[in-house]
């Protein structure tokens, strides 16, 4: 029997940054390539890197606001243009950079009139603000705005719940993710008789770290996940002897349902973070959706085809375009 030779590339894999730019203080962009890869490897690496970049990179943000003068979240403060809710939303958008662990205290103590911006936040030494010009509130009268802040470093999302509300203390929906978006694409080519691939990876960050730093941290996280397999000895996988048998945990239907509910919740949170601005839709479709207050992918998927056709100036062709573009027709009931 003649065995086919398996070709293995002798060239060393190399990462290279082919484009890097700063669009604003809160939007960094980087484009990287990895090559040469064997057929199928680019997709494997691209999917893994995208998941880690979006879900495993730690970030820092404001998670709680406290003030004894605030009766409830939807109240207003005399002498301040914004409502308490609007101030909380502005604080949520503040981008912070730090290497802290645990929780730190910060504060704002501003005497009006004047504009309160991110530079007015009194921070601990381990934390710095990425964009000092970010707006918080407009104090229109000579009154004091004094609030206490909690700052945390974590990963992913934290949605505020009723349990987290305390007297004069209000939690903020925390988005710890410093990576705003990730795209990967693959270029295939033939090198002699061998099919090879180049992986292109695009990374957008919020300015708290550069795309290159995010790529380094994601790579390190992936390596840490696989290190236990490198240290495992062969006899640890020998299940022939009774002493090496593995006892599997028992799951009840309640456990299974709880996990499924958690999975759906995580998916919903992820869809909330994808804005239609990122979908590169035609201007006319994009403007129609915006006018109908559809801003995220989750909001778009919550509309049926009939709902979309009720939008002013929206046509059947537009609905078909969206279905074809997203390739997720099954999500529309």
Curated annotation (Swiss-Prot):
Region Alpha N-terminal domain (alpha-NTD), residue ranges: 1-233
Record field: catalytic activity: RNA(n) + a ribonucleoside 5'-triphosphate = RNA(n+1) + diphosphate
InterPro entries, per the entry: DNA-dir_RNA_pol_insert, DNA-dir_RNA_pol_RpoA/D/Rpb3, DNA-dir_RpoA, RBP11-like, RNAP_asu_C, RNApol_insert_sf
SMART domains from the UniProt entry: RPOLD
Superkingdom: Eukaryota
GO biological process, one term: DNA-templated transcription
GO cellular component, one term: DNA-directed RNA polymerase complex
EC main group: transferase
EC number in record: 2.7.7.6
Molecular function as annotated in GO: DNA binding; DNA-directed RNA polymerase activity; protein dimerization activity
Span list, region Alpha C-terminal domain (alpha-CTD): 267-333
Protein's job: DNA-dependent RNA polymerase catalyzes the transcription of DNA into RNA using the four ribonucleoside triphosphates as substrates.
Family the entry assigns: Belongs to the RNA polymerase alpha chain family.
Domain remark from Swiss-Prot or TrEMBL: The N-terminal domain is essential for RNAP assembly and basal transcription, whereas the C-terminal domain is involved in interaction with transcriptional regulators and with upstream promoter elements.
Protein name as catalogued: DNA-directed RNA polymerase subunit alpha
Species in which this protein is naturally found: Glycine max
């Amino acid at each position: 029997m003649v065995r086919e030779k398996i070709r293995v590339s002798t060239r060393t894999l190399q990462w290279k940054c082919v484009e890097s730019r700063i669009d604003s203080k809160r939007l960094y962009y980087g484009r990287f390539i990895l090559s040469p890869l064997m057929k199928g490897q680019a997709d494997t690496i691209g999917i893994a890197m995208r998941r880690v970049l979006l879900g495993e990179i730690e970030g820092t943000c404001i998670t709680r606001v406290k003030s004894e003068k605030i009766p409830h979240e939807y109240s207003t403060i005399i002498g301040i243009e914004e409502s308490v809710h609007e101030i909380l939303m502005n604080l949520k958008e503040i981008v912070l950079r730090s290497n802290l662990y645990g929780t730190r205290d910060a504060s704002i103590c501003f005497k009006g009139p004047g504009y309160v911006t991110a530079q007015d936040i009194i921070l601990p030494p381990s934390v710095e603000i990425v964009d000092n010009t970010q707006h918080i509130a407009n104090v229109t009268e000579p009154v004091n705005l004094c609030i206490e802040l909690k700052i945390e470093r974590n990963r992913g999302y934290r949605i505020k719940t009723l349990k987290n509300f305390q007297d004069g203390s209000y939690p903020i929906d925390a988005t710890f993710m410093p990576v705003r978006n990730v795209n990967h694409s693959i270029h295939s080519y033939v090198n002699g008789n061998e099919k090879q691939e180049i992986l292109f990876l695009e990374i957008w960050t919020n300015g708290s770290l550069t795309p290159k730093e995010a790529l380094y941290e994601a790579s390190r996280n992936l390596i840490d996940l696989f290190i236990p397999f490198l240290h495992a000895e062969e006899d640890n996988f020998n299940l022939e002897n009774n002493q090496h048998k593995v006892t599997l945990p028992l799951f009840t239907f309640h456990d299974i349902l709880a996990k499924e509910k958690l999975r759906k919740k995580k998916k919903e949170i992820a869809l909330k973070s994808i804005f239609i601005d990122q979908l590169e839709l035609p201007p006319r479709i994009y403007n129609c959706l915006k006018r109908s207050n559809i801003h995220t992918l989750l909001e778009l998927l919550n509309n049926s085809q009939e709902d979309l056709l009720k939008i002013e100036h929206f046509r059947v062709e537009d609905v078909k375009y969206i279905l074809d573009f997203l390739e997720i027709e099954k999500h529309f009931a």
